[in-house]
A protein has these predicted regions:
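Positively charged n-region of N-terminal signal peptides that target proteins for export
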Residues: 1-7
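Surface-exposed loop/turn elements that mediate protein-protein interactions on large endomembrane-trafficking
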Residues: 29-49, 53-79, 108-125, 155-175, ...
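Repetitive helical segments and hydrophobic/amphipathic motifs
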Residues: 11-12
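Repeated scaffold domains used in trafficking and secretory/extracellular systems
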Residues: 35-46, 80-90, 129-141, 178-188, ...
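Acidic, low-complexity, intrinsically disordered interaction modules
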Residues: 87, 137-138, 143, 258-259, ...
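Short, conserved, GDST-rich strand-edge loop motifs in beta-rich repeat architectures
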Residues: 99-104, 150-156
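Residue position within the beta-strands of beta-propeller blades
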Residues: 45, 52-53, 95-97, 144-148, ...
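Sec-dependent signal peptide cleavage junction
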Residues: 15-31
Length: 372
């Protein structure tokens, strides 16, 4: 036994990533379409309303995107040390991971709550003193998938233990040893990570090569080793969206997607495509510089924070040489127009969809004050 452990340890040390399946008891389950996982500051819009959480507001449910909301859970927000670490909706329940401070330690809890704010239930909990981090990854039927991150001194790597809580039973699915595992996603009954796909129905793994993965409610987009942007739907149909992609920016949770390529001058050019429709050129980054009366030298002094579909236009939240703008362009291409510019150069813009409306606000990074 000791010899076997010694051999296993040497293999782990020799490879940057090792996948260790440990046990599987997950029977086949229907994956509900709306088990899209939002990040800690993301806004989740779905058929029954909107759920929000960020450093400045409550974890709340707005029915039909109205002004009145129901608080789902409470937490303090001292610079982000507490908060929501992933959440999703299944039926009338919200599944979420919450981090709270308790007795000089932090407690991670995987919980559920009804949309009316009642019937809170703790599925799983662990203290931070025992692990480094917990993140909710997604759902599988009535089960919640998450990982626990710990540091393994023997192999000098982080260990990500992926677990499933379902039918009042906790199952360890597999472990991943990695320096930094940042791209792990759940889509259509499979967990995608480190060029592997783990099938939750049978516990089998297959190779799935992707440099980057982006999950929406109905599609998974990924960039393969040839820099082709591809999509995968819930019938496991794959198609090439475009070749030689530079960056993926966003999707409307359907088959419409925003991305960019580099032209012969190494200038970023933005595109939009819907399904098998033709590819539309939106504009180039130099066009956005012209619209904002900012000098463009060809050197990268800009950053696209987000790109959203709204009313047949694409809205870019962009930083140009330290100034922040919202610039829009028609979905079939046009000259970009400035929609909004911050009143203070030190402020940045938070842009998001709330229900069916585009919302934005100025944020002061020094005092966390928001001007709506």
């Amino acid at each position: 036994m000791k010899k076997l452990l010694s051999i296993l340890l040497s293999v782990i040390m020799a490879m940057s990533v090792i996948i260790i399946p440990t046990s599987v008891s997950a029977k086949k389950a229907k994956t509900v379409p709306n088990t899209y996982v939002a990040t800690y500051d993301d806004i989740l819009n779905f058929s029954k309303g909107t759920i929000t959480t960020d450093f400045w507001g409550p974890f709340a449910y707005y029915k039909n995107s109205g002004n009145k909301y129901i608080t789902l859970d409470k937490y303090d927000t001292p610079y982000g040390y507490e908060g929501i670490l992933g959440y999703y909706v299944r039926g009338d329940k919200v599944y979420y991971c919450i981090k709270k401070e308790i007795f000089n330690d932090y407690l991670y809890q995987i919980k559920t709550v009804d949309l009316n704010g009642k019937n809170k239930k703790v599925l799983y909990k662990v203290k931070e003193s025992k692990i480094s981090n917990v993140l909710l990854l997604g759902g599988y039927g009535s089960g919640a998938i998450f990982y626990e991150k710990t540091y393994n001194k023997k192999v000098n790597k982080f260990c990500y233990t992926v677990k499933l809580f379902r039918n009042n039973k906790l199952t360890t699915l597999f472990k991943v040893y990695s320096d930094n595992l940042t791209n792990i996603n759940v889509f259509n009954g499979k967990i995608y990570y480190q060029n592997e796909a783990y099938n939750l129905a049978n516990g089998k793994k297959t190779t799935f090569t992707a440099k980057e993965i982006y999950v929406t409610k109905n599609y998974m987009y990924y960039i393969n080793k040839n820099n082709n942007l591809k999509s995968l739907d819930k019938k496991d149909v794959r198609r090439i969206v475009t070749k030689n992609v530079y960056k993926y920016y966003n999707s409307n949770n359907g088959s419409s997607v925003i991305y960019s390529k580099l032209n012969s001058k190494k200038e970023e050019v933005f595109y939009k495509r819907t399904g098998t429709d033709k590819e539309y050129k939106l504009c180039a980054i130099s066009d956005i510089y012209k619209a904002t009366n900012t000098s463009y030298t060809g050197k990268k002094h800009y950053w696209i924070n987000d790109a959203l579909f709204y009313n047949n236009k694409v809205y870019f939240n962009i930083s140009l040489d330290g100034s922040y703008y919202i610039v829009n362009v028609k979905t079939r291409g046009s000259k970009p127009s400035v929609f909004f510019k911050t009143t203070n150069k030190d402020y940045y813009i938070d842009m998001y969809m709330f229900g069916n409306k585009l919302e934005y606000r100025e944020c002061d990074p020094n005092s966390y004050i928001i001007d709506d």
